[in-house]
C-alpha cells in the first residue's frame, strides 16, 4: 500500500517525536493516491466523494483532525489502506480513531456501527458529511431505481440511528 509520503515507509506516528503530523494537503494527496482508480456506484472517480465529504466537514466547522478523517474515512473500509498503515501514519490519534469509528466491519449490525460512531469524539460530524453526500438526490439520480431506493432507505435508517434530523 502507498504510504503518506508516497514512499515505502510511513512517517512516524504523531506525538512519537518521529515526525510532524501530516498537513491537510498531505492527507488529501495521500487519500487521492490510495483511492486512485476507484469509482463510486455511479462510476464517478471516488476522489470526488472524498472531496465532497471533506467540504461538508469544513462547512460544518470541523477541526483539522476531522478534516483529515473525512479524506480518509473510507480508506480502511475499501482496502485502500490497512489498519496497520493507518496506525503508523503521522496523524493525530483522534483522526485515526475517527477513521476506524466510521469504518464498517463485515457482518456488523448497523446499531453497533452507529453506537461506535456516537461513542468516538468527532466521528459523528464526519459521518454526517458522508451521509449528506451519499444521500444527495443528484448523486442518487445517477443510479438505477432499485439501487437508489435501497440506498435511500439505508441512509435514512442510519440517520435515525445516529439521531440526525431528516
Regions found by a protein language model. Name each.
Residues 2-166:
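Active-site helical microenvironments for divalent-metal-assisted chemistry
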Amino acid at each position: 500500500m502507498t504510504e503518506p509520503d508516497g514512499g515505502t515507509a510511513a512517517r512516524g506516528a504523531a506525538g512519537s517525536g518521529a515526525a510532524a503530523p501530516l498537513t491537510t494537503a498531505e492527507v488529501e494527496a495521500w487519500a487521492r493516491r490510495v483511492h486512485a482508480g476507484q469509482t463510486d456506484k455511479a462510476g464517478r472517480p471516488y476522489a470526488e466523494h472524498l472531496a465532497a465529504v471533506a467540504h461538508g466537514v469544513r462547512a460544518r466547522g470541523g477541526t483539522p483532525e476531522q478534516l483529515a478523517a473525512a479524506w480518509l474515512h473510507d480508506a480502511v473500509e475499501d482496502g485502500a489502506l490497512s489498519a496497520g498503515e493507518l496506525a503508523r501514519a503521522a496523524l493525530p490519534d483522534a483522526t485515526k480513531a475517527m477513521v476506524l469509528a466510521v469504518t464498517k466491519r463485515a457482518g456488523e449490525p448497523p446499531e453497533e456501527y452507529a453506537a461506535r460512531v456516537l461513542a468516538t469524539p468527532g466521528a459523528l460530524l464526519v459521518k454526517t458529511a458522508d451521509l449528506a453526500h451519499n444521500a444527495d438526490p443528484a448523486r442518487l439520480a445517477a443510479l438505477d431505481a432499485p439501487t437508489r431506493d435501497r440506498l435511500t432507505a439505508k441512509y435514512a435508517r442510519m440517520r435515525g440511528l445516529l439521531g440526525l434530523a431528516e
